[in-house]
Amino acid sequence: MSEINVMERTRELVVNPLVTCQPFGAMFATLGIRRGLPIVHGSQGCSTFVRYGLNRHFREPAEIAVTSLHEDAAVFGGRSNLIDGVKNLVKRFRPELVGIVTTCSSEITGDDVDGFLRVAEAELREELGERFRTRMVSISTPSFVEHHLRGYGNALKSFIDTLAVDEGDCNERINLIPGIVNPGDIREIRHIFELMDVDPIILTDTSDPFDSPLRPSKTEKMPFYPKGGTVVSDIEESSNSIGTLSMSMYGNEASETLKKRFNIPKEHHIPIGVRNTDDFVRSLARIAEVDVSEELLDERGILIDSMADISSRYLFGRTAAVYGDPDMVMGVSRFLCELGITPLYACVGVDNEIFREGMKRVASEADERINVMINSDLRALERELTEEPVDFMIGNSDGRLIARDLGIPLVRMGFPVYDRVGYHRIPVVGYRGSVNLLNRITNTVLREYYEPQHWKLQQ
């Protein structure tokens, strides 16, 4: 029966949430810019929470400034905090870009962030003269509504609105919006672009900032920044690209802005599994007007061969529950169906029409009935799994206690993974990344269902 059973959370209380607040996504996007620094216009806890979350997943420090609003700012506003904070940040760190990220407190008090920034920029020009070259981008992320994915999308749209300029000359490049993914995933997508001989503009590139080599700074005078990141000039050039490929459904506002303002075509694909990666590669080849490389076809063949070797023997007929961000859940669900596994539950903490339609397509292609949990949380998933368990779960480390209590093995992926190390370096996108994911799933099944009975492994 090819249909989805949409299950929406009916209670107001969220228990063990699948999403976090908007500023998280905005800070993540800003840190993907070369010599870019976010400054949080809010309390100290707003930045500490995000730094902690990023650190325990990537095992890397995250440079995030904060205006440190206190009780008086809730009454009188945070004008002086923001102006002084931005000026100190520019003078001490000399960033190429500062992203000013709002929070609950600054949004509710109604601070005129853009007006405060104009004052700060005027004072910096007066004090520093030509040495002041930092670009300022205001990012509205009221954290009492929506979630981190919306904050990520708002940040990208703000970068495009503020920085992109139409110079009229086509640069023959393709904009890539990767979404909130791991460094290994971005490197794998860059590898695909290289095989296709296409130069991407990655909006934004967090691969090196969140997985940088530990080496001495090359100069003692310049503040230390991690290597890599998208240069500001590339964001300015994004308006002259030949197309935009988005791996994030919440990056669509940025790609839609590029389409409306600069007439740049856009497409959305999450390259996990065979069909999804095929769609991504076809779009890339069509937009860039290039042929698919033989090396990429070989990588596809290796994935197909791995599926033929493994799927029917160990995976066919099994059931799974997938939870996390909607792009990941939708991509993994389609890949599971290709492996002969039924994604019995697809659980996300948001409601998005692209996700709903995508899951309908997955169910139709596989002729399966999938329970799609919308605006949900891990507590709701736990209750469903108690009634109808699955063979394994796929998602981040936040589901580890459910997996332990119910005796269901957990295949870790997505964000955050904090009870294992190195996962952020291992891609799960593209053909090679899908082989990694296939191996991870299969080894989990072998350990749980075959290892206790060793004779089955000899069959």
UniProtKB/Swiss-Prot annotation:
This is Nitrogenase molybdenum-iron protein beta chain. [8Fe-7S] cluster binds at residues 21, 46, 104, 143. GO terms for biological process: nitrogen fixation. It comes from Methanothermobacter thermautotrophicus (strain ATCC 29096 / DSM 1053 / JCM 10044 / NBRC 100330 / Delta H) (Methanobacterium thermoautotrophicum). Pfam families: Oxidored_nitro. Binds 1 [8Fe-7S] cluster per heterodimer. It catalyses: N2 + 8 reduced [2Fe-2S]-[ferredoxin] + 16 ATP + 16 H2O = H2 + 8 oxidized [2Fe-2S]-[ferredoxin] + 2 NH4(+) + 16 ADP + 16 phosphate + 6 H(+). GO terms for molecular function: ATP binding; iron-sulfur cluster binding; metal ion binding; nitrogenase activity. Keywords: ATP-binding, Iron, Iron-sulfur, Metal-binding, Nitrogen fixation, Nucleotide-binding, Oxidoreductase. Belongs to the NifD/NifK/NifE/NifN family.
